[in-house]
């Protein structure tokens, strides 16, 4: 039900509200109060003797608490009667820019395809973080959840780089959102808000019934902040599209996920396409990113690389512009030689930095999704072994950085490592290419022999250019069905 009310602030007059028996209505009532320069929205929630006034002007920001309004508020308390009961007035300062931004972003969100991580996120937990490289679909995934679950509460989606936060605090927004009945707050690109981890901690401690989900592309900043939230936040890393997801998104070919054990047993298959290899070739070139189907994919991917280095890494590590350019050069060198067997001294000389800084720069690039570092198992703990090889993170990046000069053998290894490390601990092999659990993997083309795995228990030959598994020979594309 909508009721229009004219409010003359000059005369501080209000009418039409007191004659409504709001308590007899089960639906929300929206009372819109129009003036030439302002729009006022008044909402009664239908369950309590409480009238909520949203003060919004046409610029989309808030009018100040002027003398007129301060005089108007007591008058509202005095004159708004429902069934001889005085309505409590509660002023909620929620900026319409944020609601309009959310509605516009939701309108643009595709809903036909969900990423692998969607079903694994405990969306109703109090504080959840989703991390991953730029452009892999984190924002789309959380907006899809909003679109599919609006019956579960009241949602607000914001991006931390919105101009609203230039002079508003995140914690204040959460306070007002909860007062207005908000239940789920989604904060995109949270690392772009300074002091985000402290304020999320405050929100967590103060609003135990508010569900907060945040995303971040700058994994470096997220990891630093997550240390402060270690006992509060559940943080989930997200990868780019698997080959299975690529087939679903771009070719409408559905396939289940297969565990590594099922793949090694030769059970991996895709129904709906007779010959998967042409699709696999396409995926290697431009299938890892959800924006692969857009015009100008290569240019956008180059922009992802530039922004990752110049913004995420440089700002996190407080690097000069000249040092950021050296990191770009380092990435180009790795791309031309990948899998790169690291020589810190040679790499330092090549790009003109101290040898002591090279491992740190490599770690920055690894954590922002530009490279992968394959380690041995000498560290005893995951991720602490000696770095044996450095890979570009995924084949799409290899082609974007190296073009036609890319080596297909390197592409194959990069694909295997990229797809397997999403759900498995992958370490280097002294005899072959990779070790996962009790299995040793040798990667190659159709003519790849068994020499490297002779006498090795659990040895697996992974071949490109074949469609079917036989014995311990598994098609390379099968490993793209793991998530």
PLM segments and residue spans:
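Interdomain motor-coupling "hinge/lid" segment immediately C-terminal to the ATP-binding subdomain
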Residues: 94, 217, 223-327, 331
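Short glycine-rich substrate-engagement loop in P-loop NTPases that contacts/grips substrate
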Residues: 153-181
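N-terminal pre-Walker A segment at the start of P-loop NTPase domains
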Residues: 81-119
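Accessory nucleic acid-recognition modules appended to NTPase machines
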Residues: 293-430
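Hydrophobic anchor at the beta1->P-loop junction of P-loop NTPases
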Residues: 130
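Hydrophobic positions on the alpha1 helix immediately C-terminal to the Walker A/P-loop
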Residues: 141
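Conserved lysine of the Walker
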Residues: 138
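Conserved catalytic cores of phosphodiester-cleaving nucleases, focusing on short active-site segments
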Residues: 416, 420, 434-449
């Amino acid at each position: 039900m909508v009721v229009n009310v004219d409010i003359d602030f000059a005369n501080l007059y209000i009418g039409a509200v007191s004659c409504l028996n709001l308590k007899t209505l089960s639906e929300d009532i929206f009372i819109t109060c129009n003036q030439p320069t302002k729009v006022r929205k008044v909402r009664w929630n239908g369950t309590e003797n409480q009238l909520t006034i949203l003060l919004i002007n046409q610029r989309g920001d808030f009018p100040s608490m002027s003398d007129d309004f301060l005089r108007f508020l007591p008058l509202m308390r005095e004159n708004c009667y429902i069934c001889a009961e005085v309505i409590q007035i509660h002023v909620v300062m929620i900026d319409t820019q944020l609601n309009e931004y959310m509605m516009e972003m939701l309108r643009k969100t595709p809903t036909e395809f969900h990423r692998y991580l969607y079903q694994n996120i405990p969306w109703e937990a109090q504080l959840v973080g989703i991390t991953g490289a730029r452009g892999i679909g984190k924002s789309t995934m959380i907006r899809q959840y909003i679109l599919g679950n609006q019956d579960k509460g009241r949602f607000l989606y914001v991006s931390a780089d919105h101009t609203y936060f230039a002079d508003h605090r995140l914690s204040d927004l959460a306070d007002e959102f909860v007062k207005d009945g908000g239940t789920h707050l989604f904060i995109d690109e949270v690392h772009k808000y300074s002091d985000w981890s402290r304020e999320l901690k405050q929100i967590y401690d103060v609003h135990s019934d508010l569900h907060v989900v945040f995303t971040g592309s700058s994994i470096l900043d997220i990891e630093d902040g997550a240390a402060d939230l270690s006992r509060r936040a559940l943080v989930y890393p997200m990868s780019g599209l698997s080959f299975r997801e690529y087939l679903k998104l771009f070719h409408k070919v559905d396939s289940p996920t297969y565990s590594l054990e099922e793949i090694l047993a030769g059970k991996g298959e895709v129904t709906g396409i007779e010959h998967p290899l042409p699709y696999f070739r396409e995926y290697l070139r431009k299938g890892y990113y959800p924006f692969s189907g857009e015009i100008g994919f290569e240019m956008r991917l180059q922009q992802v690389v530039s922004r990752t280095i110049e913004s995420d890494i440089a700002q996190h590590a407080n690097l000069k512009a000249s040092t950021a350019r050296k990191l770009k050069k380092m990435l180009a060198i790795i791309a031309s030689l990948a899998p790169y067997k690291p020589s810190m001294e040679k790499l330092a000389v090549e790009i003109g930095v101290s040898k002591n800084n090279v491992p740190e720069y490599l770690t920055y690039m690894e954590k922002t999704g530009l490279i992968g570092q394959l380690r041995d198992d000498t560290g005893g703990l995951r991720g602490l072994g000696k770095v044996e090889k450095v890979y570009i993170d995924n084949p799409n990046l290899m082609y974007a950085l190296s073009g036609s000069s890319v080596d297909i053998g390197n592409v194959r290894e990069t694909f295997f490592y990229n797809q397997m490390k999403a759900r498995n601990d992958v370490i280097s092999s002294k005899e072959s290419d990779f070790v996962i659990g009790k299995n040793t993997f040798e990667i190659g083309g159709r003519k790849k022999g068994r020499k490297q795995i002779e006498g090795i228990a659990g040895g697996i030959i992974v071949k490109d250019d074949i469609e079917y598994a036989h014995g311990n020979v598994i098609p390379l594309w099968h490993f793209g069905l793991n998530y």
